[in-house]
C-alpha cells in the first residue's frame, strides 16, 4: 500500500512540473522563432508538438518556421492542421496563403486571403497579400485597387 501511495504522489507532484516544462519549451521555441533562429526553433516546436499535438498556435508557428527554412509544403501542412483545430482563426489562413505564394499557387493563396477578408474587409495584411497575388496573376488594376484600400 505504501508503494502505491508513493507512486501516486510522485505522479501527482510531477504533473505541474511537466506543465511548466511544456510551457518553458513553448517559450523557448517562440523566442528562437522571434529571433530568427529557425534552425534552433524547428526541433523545439517538434518536441513541443510531440507532447501537445492539438495546439493550433504551435502548429501555425512551426509552419512559419518551416516556410522560413524553405519548406513551403511542410508549412502548408502545419497551417492546414492548425485551421482544422482552430477554424475561425485568421493567422493560419494568412500564413498558409504566404506558403502557397511561395509555391506560386496563386489561386489557393487568394482563397485564403479572401477567407480573411470575408470576415474582416479591412485586414491590412490580407489586402496587401491579395494585391501581391493579383499582381502575380497579371491583374494589375485589381492589385492597385486592393493596395489603395
Name each model feature, range by range.
Residues 21-22, 56-57, 90-91, 124-125:
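Helix-start (N-cap) detector for alpha-helical repeat units in TPR-like alpha-solenoids
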Residues 47-50, 77, 81-84, 115-118:
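Conserved structural position within tetratricopeptide repeats
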Residues 34-35, 68, 102, 136:
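Register position in tetratricopeptide repeats
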Amino acid at each position: 500500500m505504501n508503494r502505491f501511495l508513493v507512486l501516486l504522489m510522485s505522479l501527482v507532484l510531477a504533473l505541474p512540473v511537466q506543465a511548466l516544462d511544456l510551457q518553458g519549451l513553448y517559450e523557448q521555441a517562440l523566442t528562437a522563432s522571434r529571433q530568427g533562429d529557425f534552425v534552433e526553433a524547428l526541433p523545439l516546436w517538434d518536441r513541443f508538438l510531440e507532447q501537445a499535438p492539438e495546439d493550433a498556435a504551435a502548429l501555425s508557428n512551426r509552419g512559419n518556421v518551416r516556410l522560413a527554412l524553405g519548406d513551403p509544403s511542410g508549412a502548408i501542412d502545419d497551417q492546414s492542421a492548425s485551421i482544422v483545430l482552430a477554424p475561425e482563426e485568421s493567422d493560419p489562413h494568412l500564413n498558409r496563403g504566404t506558403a502557397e505564394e511561395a509555391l506560386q499557387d496563386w489561386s489557393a493563396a487568394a482563397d485564403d486571403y479572401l477567407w480573411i477578408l470575408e470576415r474582416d474587409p479591412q485586414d491590412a495584411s490580407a489586402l496587401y497579400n491579395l494585391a501581391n497575388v493579383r499582381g502575380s496573376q497579371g491583374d494589375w488594376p485589381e492589385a492597385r485597387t486592393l493596395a489603395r484600400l
